[in-house]
Protein backbone atom coordinates (compact mmCIF):
# COMPACT_ATOMS: atom_id res chain seq x y z
CA UNK A 1 0.00 0.00 0.00
CA UNK A 2 1.01 3.65 -0.24
CA UNK A 3 1.29 6.27 2.47
CA UNK A 4 -2.18 7.62 3.08
CA UNK A 5 -3.89 4.59 1.58
CA UNK A 6 -6.74 2.77 3.25
CA UNK A 7 -6.99 -0.90 4.16
CA UNK A 8 -10.13 -2.12 5.88
CA UNK A 9 -10.53 -4.90 8.42
CA UNK A 10 -10.96 -8.20 6.60
CA UNK A 11 -9.25 -7.16 3.38
CA UNK A 12 -6.11 -8.74 1.95
CA UNK A 13 -2.93 -7.00 0.86
CA UNK A 14 0.21 -8.07 -0.98
CA UNK A 15 3.39 -6.13 -0.26
CA UNK A 16 6.04 -6.57 -2.92
CA UNK A 17 9.57 -5.42 -3.66
CA UNK A 18 11.63 -5.33 -6.85
CA UNK A 19 15.39 -5.83 -6.71
CA UNK A 20 18.16 -6.53 -9.22
CA UNK A 21 20.89 -9.09 -8.69
CA UNK A 22 21.54 -12.81 -8.45
CA UNK A 23 20.77 -15.24 -5.65
CA UNK A 24 18.76 -12.70 -3.69
CA UNK A 25 17.32 -13.41 -0.27
CA UNK A 26 14.43 -11.52 1.27
CA UNK A 27 13.45 -10.89 4.86
CA UNK A 28 10.31 -8.91 5.59
CA UNK A 29 10.12 -7.13 8.94
CA UNK A 30 7.39 -5.52 10.97
CA UNK A 31 8.57 -2.82 13.35
CA UNK A 32 12.12 -4.10 12.86
CA UNK A 33 11.32 -7.71 13.80
CA UNK A 34 11.71 -10.53 11.25
CA UNK A 35 8.49 -12.09 9.98
CA UNK A 36 8.81 -15.86 9.75
CA UNK A 37 6.60 -16.07 6.65
CA UNK A 38 8.27 -13.12 4.97
CA UNK A 39 11.14 -14.69 3.02
CA UNK A 40 10.16 -13.99 -0.59
CA UNK A 41 9.77 -10.92 -2.79
CA UNK A 42 6.15 -10.64 -1.70
CA UNK A 43 4.48 -10.69 1.70
CA UNK A 44 0.75 -11.35 1.93
CA UNK A 45 -1.61 -10.18 4.65
CA UNK A 46 -5.00 -11.88 4.72
CA UNK A 47 -8.00 -10.94 6.83
CA UNK A 48 -6.41 -7.67 7.93
CA UNK A 49 -6.85 -6.98 11.63
CA UNK A 50 -5.73 -3.77 13.38
CA UNK A 51 -4.47 -5.67 16.44
CA UNK A 52 -2.35 -8.02 14.33
CA UNK A 53 -1.25 -6.08 11.29
CA UNK A 54 -0.87 -2.39 12.16
CA UNK A 55 2.80 -1.47 11.94
CA UNK A 56 5.82 -0.34 9.94
CA UNK A 57 6.76 -2.87 7.25
CA UNK A 58 10.12 -3.09 5.48
CA UNK A 59 12.20 -5.74 3.72
CA UNK A 60 15.91 -6.54 3.75
CA UNK A 61 17.23 -7.79 0.41
CA UNK A 62 20.64 -9.49 0.46
CA UNK A 63 23.09 -11.73 -1.38
CA UNK A 64 26.78 -12.62 -0.93
CA UNK A 65 27.79 -9.08 -1.78
CA UNK A 66 25.78 -7.38 0.95
CA UNK A 67 22.29 -6.28 1.88
CA UNK A 68 20.01 -3.28 1.69
CA UNK A 69 16.88 -2.42 3.64
CA UNK A 70 13.94 -0.61 2.07
CA UNK A 71 12.26 2.35 3.68
CA UNK A 72 9.24 1.45 5.78
CA UNK A 73 5.59 1.46 4.79
CA UNK A 74 3.24 2.26 7.64
CA UNK A 75 0.13 0.12 7.47
CA UNK A 76 -2.97 1.16 9.39
CA UNK A 77 -6.06 -1.02 9.26
CA UNK A 78 -9.38 0.77 9.51
CA UNK A 79 -11.88 -0.99 11.70
CA UNK A 80 -15.15 0.24 10.22
CA UNK A 81 -16.96 -0.70 13.43
CA UNK A 82 -14.96 1.83 15.43
CA UNK A 83 -15.23 5.58 15.72
CA UNK A 84 -12.83 7.70 13.69
CA UNK A 85 -14.69 10.99 13.88
CA UNK A 86 -12.68 13.84 12.41
CA UNK A 87 -9.96 11.65 10.91
CA UNK A 88 -9.33 12.03 7.20
CA UNK A 89 -8.59 9.02 5.02
CA UNK A 90 -7.21 9.25 1.53
CA UNK A 91 -8.79 6.57 -0.61
CA UNK A 92 -6.52 5.43 -3.39
CA UNK A 93 -8.72 5.72 -6.45
CA UNK A 94 -9.03 7.31 -9.85
CA UNK A 95 -11.01 10.10 -8.23
CA UNK A 96 -8.36 10.73 -5.53
CA UNK A 97 -10.89 11.55 -2.83
CA UNK A 98 -10.47 12.42 0.81
CA UNK A 99 -13.10 10.99 3.12
CA UNK A 100 -13.96 11.55 6.76
CA UNK A 101 -15.40 8.82 8.96
CA UNK A 102 -18.71 9.88 10.53
CA UNK A 103 -19.49 7.73 13.58
CA UNK A 104 -22.96 6.53 14.50
CA UNK A 105 -24.93 8.78 16.81
CA UNK A 106 -28.11 10.78 17.33
CA UNK A 107 -29.04 14.37 16.58
CA UNK A 108 -31.97 16.75 16.35
CA UNK A 109 -32.90 17.11 12.67
CA UNK A 110 -34.91 20.07 11.43
CA UNK A 111 -35.20 23.52 12.97
CA UNK A 112 -36.96 25.14 15.94
CA UNK A 113 -40.02 27.25 15.17
CA UNK A 114 -38.24 30.49 16.05
CA UNK A 115 -35.15 29.97 13.87
CA UNK A 116 -34.51 32.96 11.61
CA UNK A 117 -35.12 32.07 7.97
CA UNK A 118 -37.05 28.89 8.77
CA UNK A 119 -39.21 27.69 5.88
CA UNK A 120 -41.94 26.06 7.95
CA UNK A 121 -43.55 22.64 7.97
CA UNK A 122 -40.80 20.95 5.97
CA UNK A 123 -38.40 21.45 8.89
CA UNK A 124 -40.24 19.89 11.86
CA UNK A 125 -37.68 19.04 14.54
CA UNK A 126 -37.34 15.34 15.34
CA UNK A 127 -34.73 13.06 16.88
CA UNK A 128 -32.79 10.95 14.40
CA UNK A 129 -30.45 8.06 15.12
CA UNK A 130 -27.73 7.19 12.63
CA UNK A 131 -26.99 3.61 13.65
CA UNK A 132 -24.15 2.89 11.23
CA UNK A 133 -21.09 5.02 10.70
CA UNK A 134 -20.17 6.03 7.16
CA UNK A 135 -17.52 7.88 5.21
CA UNK A 136 -18.33 11.24 3.61
CA UNK A 137 -16.33 13.40 1.25
CA UNK A 138 -14.28 16.05 3.01
CA UNK A 139 -14.99 18.32 0.05
CA UNK A 140 -17.58 18.60 -2.68
CA UNK A 141 -16.60 16.49 -5.70
CA UNK A 142 -14.23 18.57 -7.82
CA UNK A 143 -14.10 18.97 -11.56
CA UNK A 144 -10.78 17.10 -11.63
CA UNK A 145 -12.30 14.16 -9.76
CA UNK A 146 -15.32 14.06 -12.03
CA UNK A 147 -13.09 14.18 -15.10
CA UNK A 148 -10.91 11.36 -13.78
CA UNK A 149 -13.93 9.06 -13.71
CA UNK A 150 -15.91 10.12 -16.79
CA UNK A 151 -13.37 11.98 -18.93
CA UNK A 152 -15.53 15.08 -19.22
CA UNK A 153 -16.40 18.25 -17.33
CA UNK A 154 -19.88 19.77 -17.66
CA UNK A 155 -19.15 22.77 -15.42
CA UNK A 156 -19.62 26.44 -16.31
CA UNK A 157 -16.99 27.78 -13.92
CA UNK A 158 -13.97 25.88 -15.17
CA UNK A 159 -11.26 25.19 -12.61
CA UNK A 160 -10.01 21.73 -11.71
CA UNK A 161 -10.34 22.31 -7.95
CA UNK A 162 -13.73 24.01 -8.04
CA UNK A 163 -16.77 21.82 -7.43
CA UNK A 164 -18.24 20.15 -10.49
CA UNK A 165 -21.66 21.60 -11.32
CA UNK A 166 -24.23 21.26 -14.08
CA UNK A 167 -24.79 17.65 -13.02
CA UNK A 168 -28.24 16.18 -12.49
CA UNK A 169 -29.23 13.59 -9.93
CA UNK A 170 -29.48 11.13 -12.82
CA UNK A 171 -25.98 12.03 -14.02
CA UNK A 172 -24.62 11.16 -10.60
CA UNK A 173 -26.63 8.00 -9.95
CA UNK A 174 -26.91 6.52 -13.42
CA UNK A 175 -23.46 7.32 -14.77
CA UNK A 176 -20.85 8.62 -12.32
CA UNK A 177 -21.50 6.29 -9.39
CA UNK A 178 -21.79 3.01 -11.34
CA UNK A 179 -18.53 3.70 -13.17
CA UNK A 180 -16.68 4.85 -10.04
CA UNK A 181 -17.82 1.81 -8.05
CA UNK A 182 -16.86 -0.56 -10.85
CA UNK A 183 -13.40 1.04 -11.09
CA UNK A 184 -12.86 0.85 -7.35
CA UNK A 185 -14.04 -2.75 -7.07
CA UNK A 186 -11.90 -3.83 -10.04
CA UNK A 187 -8.85 -2.13 -8.52
CA UNK A 188 -9.46 -3.72 -5.11
CA UNK A 189 -10.01 -0.38 -3.41
CA UNK A 190 -13.41 -1.21 -1.92
CA UNK A 191 -14.07 -3.85 0.73
CA UNK A 192 -16.85 -6.30 -0.06
CA UNK A 193 -20.28 -4.75 0.38
CA UNK A 194 -19.09 -1.13 0.34
CA UNK A 195 -20.12 1.37 -2.35
CA UNK A 196 -20.01 5.05 -3.13
CA UNK A 197 -23.50 6.55 -2.90
CA UNK A 198 -25.18 9.87 -2.31
CA UNK A 199 -25.85 10.43 1.40
CA UNK A 200 -29.39 10.51 2.70
CA UNK A 201 -30.75 13.86 3.81
CA UNK A 202 -30.43 12.75 7.44
CA UNK A 203 -26.80 11.65 6.99
CA UNK A 204 -25.98 14.90 5.22
CA UNK A 205 -27.54 17.06 7.94
CA UNK A 206 -25.91 14.98 10.69
CA UNK A 207 -22.49 15.54 9.11
CA UNK A 208 -23.24 19.20 8.45
CA UNK A 209 -24.33 19.93 12.01
CA UNK A 210 -21.35 18.06 13.47
CA UNK A 211 -22.89 18.25 16.92
CA UNK A 212 -24.30 21.77 16.58
CA UNK A 213 -27.92 22.75 17.21
CA UNK A 214 -27.70 26.25 15.74
CA UNK A 215 -28.92 27.47 12.35
CA UNK A 216 -25.48 26.91 10.85
CA UNK A 217 -22.74 24.58 11.99
CA UNK A 218 -20.78 27.59 13.28
CA UNK A 219 -23.60 29.50 14.97
CA UNK A 220 -26.84 31.37 14.30
CA UNK A 221 -25.45 33.91 11.85
CA UNK A 222 -23.40 33.76 8.68
CA UNK A 223 -21.17 36.14 6.73
CA UNK A 224 -19.23 36.17 3.47
CA UNK A 225 -16.08 35.23 5.39
CA UNK A 226 -17.69 31.89 6.31
CA UNK A 227 -19.29 30.77 3.04
CA UNK A 228 -19.82 31.56 -0.64
CA UNK A 229 -23.42 32.68 -0.99
CA UNK A 230 -25.84 35.42 -2.04
CA UNK A 231 -23.66 36.68 -4.91
CA UNK A 232 -20.84 37.85 -2.61
CA UNK A 233 -18.35 36.13 -4.93
CA UNK A 234 -19.70 37.24 -8.33
CA UNK A 235 -22.31 34.46 -8.35
CA UNK A 236 -19.76 31.76 -9.15
CA UNK A 237 -18.15 28.85 -7.34
CA UNK A 238 -15.01 29.00 -5.21
CA UNK A 239 -12.18 26.52 -4.83
CA UNK A 240 -13.32 23.69 -2.56
CA UNK A 241 -12.05 24.22 0.97
CA UNK A 242 -11.84 28.01 0.67
CA UNK A 243 -13.74 28.51 3.94
CA UNK A 244 -13.41 27.05 7.42
CA UNK A 245 -14.34 23.43 8.07
CA UNK A 246 -16.94 22.34 10.59
CA UNK A 247 -16.21 20.39 13.78
CA UNK A 248 -16.21 17.06 11.93
CA UNK A 249 -13.78 18.45 9.35
CA UNK A 250 -16.10 18.99 6.37
CA UNK A 251 -15.75 21.98 4.08
CA UNK A 252 -18.42 23.93 2.18
CA UNK A 253 -21.44 22.33 3.80
CA UNK A 254 -22.89 25.83 3.61
CA UNK A 255 -22.84 27.50 0.19
CA UNK A 256 -20.64 27.14 -2.90
CA UNK A 257 -22.91 24.56 -4.61
CA UNK A 258 -26.09 22.94 -3.39
CA UNK A 259 -25.57 19.20 -3.00
CA UNK A 260 -27.75 16.36 -4.21
CA UNK A 261 -28.83 13.83 -1.58
CA UNK A 262 -30.66 10.57 -2.16
CA UNK A 263 -34.09 11.46 -0.73
CA UNK A 264 -37.25 12.30 -2.62
CA UNK A 265 -39.01 15.45 -1.47
CA UNK A 266 -42.38 14.78 0.14
CA UNK A 267 -45.61 16.42 -1.05
CA UNK A 268 -48.84 16.56 0.93
CA UNK A 269 -52.28 15.85 -0.53
CA UNK A 270 -52.37 19.40 -1.92
CA UNK A 271 -49.05 18.87 -3.75
CA UNK A 272 -47.28 21.24 -1.40
CA UNK A 273 -43.76 20.30 -0.23
CA UNK A 274 -43.92 19.31 3.41
CA UNK A 275 -41.84 17.52 5.99
CA UNK A 276 -42.07 13.76 5.55
CA UNK A 277 -41.41 13.23 9.25
CA UNK A 278 -43.44 14.06 12.33
CA UNK A 279 -41.77 14.91 15.62
CA UNK A 280 -41.44 11.18 16.37
CA UNK A 281 -38.02 9.56 16.68
CA UNK A 282 -36.51 8.19 13.48
CA UNK A 283 -33.75 5.65 12.87
CA UNK A 284 -31.72 5.82 9.64
CA UNK A 285 -34.56 7.52 7.74
CA UNK A 286 -34.58 7.18 3.96
CA UNK A 287 -37.40 9.57 3.13
CA UNK A 288 -40.38 8.81 0.86
CA UNK A 289 -40.20 5.66 -1.26
CA UNK A 290 -41.06 7.55 -4.44
CA UNK A 291 -41.57 11.03 -5.74
CA UNK A 292 -40.96 13.56 -8.48
CA UNK A 293 -38.12 15.72 -7.18
CA UNK A 294 -34.92 15.02 -5.26
CA UNK A 295 -33.65 17.09 -2.34
CA UNK A 296 -30.62 19.36 -2.51
CA UNK A 297 -28.94 20.70 0.62
CA UNK A 298 -26.56 23.43 1.69
CA UNK A 299 -27.47 26.36 -0.52
CA UNK A 300 -25.22 27.79 -3.21
CA UNK A 301 -23.17 30.75 -4.37
CA UNK A 302 -26.33 32.54 -5.51
CA UNK A 303 -28.71 31.59 -2.68
CA UNK A 304 -29.56 33.75 0.32
CA UNK A 305 -28.53 32.77 3.83
CA UNK A 306 -31.81 31.06 4.77
CA UNK A 307 -31.08 28.36 2.16
CA UNK A 308 -27.67 27.73 3.73
CA UNK A 309 -29.04 26.72 7.14
CA UNK A 310 -28.29 23.16 8.23
CA UNK A 311 -31.98 22.22 8.23
CA UNK A 312 -32.89 23.94 4.96
CA UNK A 313 -33.75 21.95 1.88
CA UNK A 314 -34.55 22.70 -1.73
CA UNK A 315 -35.47 20.29 -4.51
CA UNK A 316 -35.15 19.73 -8.24
CA UNK A 317 -36.31 17.23 -10.85
CA UNK A 318 -34.07 14.21 -11.40
CA UNK A 319 -32.78 15.55 -14.71
CA UNK A 320 -32.39 19.17 -13.63
CA UNK A 321 -28.92 20.68 -13.78
CA UNK A 322 -27.41 24.14 -13.47
CA UNK A 323 -24.23 25.78 -12.21
CA UNK A 324 -25.57 25.98 -8.66
CA UNK A 325 -25.80 22.21 -8.03
CA UNK A 326 -23.05 19.68 -7.37
CA UNK A 327 -22.63 16.76 -5.00
CA UNK A 328 -20.61 15.12 -2.24
CA UNK A 329 -20.12 11.37 -1.99
CA UNK A 330 -20.68 8.97 0.87
CA UNK A 331 -19.00 5.58 1.17
CA UNK A 332 -21.26 3.12 2.95
CA UNK A 333 -21.63 -0.56 3.66
CA UNK A 334 -24.74 -2.19 2.22
CA UNK A 335 -26.98 -3.54 4.96
Question: Which residues fall in each region the model found?
Answer:
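Solvent-exposed loop segments of extracellular immunoglobulin-like
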Residues: 20-27
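Surface-exposed, flexible coil segments in extracellular/virion-facing regions
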Residues: 30-47, 158-159
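Functional-site microenvironments in short loops/helix caps that host divalent-cation chemistry
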Residues: 108, 113, 117, 158, ...
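A short glycine-rich, aromatic-capped structural motif
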Residues: 92-155, 167-170, 255, 329
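A short beta-strand segment in extracellular, disulfide-stabilized domains
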Residues: 11-18
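Surface-exposed, proline-enriched loop/turn segments that connect beta strands in immunoglobulin-like
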Residues: 1-4
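Solvent-exposed loop/turn motifs of extracellular immunoglobulin-like beta-sandwich domains
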Residues: 49-58
Amino acid sequence: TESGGVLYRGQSLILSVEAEGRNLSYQWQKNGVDLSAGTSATYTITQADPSLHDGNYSVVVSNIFGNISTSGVILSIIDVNSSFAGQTFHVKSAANMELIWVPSGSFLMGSPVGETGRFGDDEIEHNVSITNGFFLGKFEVTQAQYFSVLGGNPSDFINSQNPVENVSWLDVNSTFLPILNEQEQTNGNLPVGWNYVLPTEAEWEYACRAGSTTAYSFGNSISSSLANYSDYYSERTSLVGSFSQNTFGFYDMHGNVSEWVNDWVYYDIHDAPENFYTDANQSDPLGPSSGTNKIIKGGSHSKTENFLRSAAKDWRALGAKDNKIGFRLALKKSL
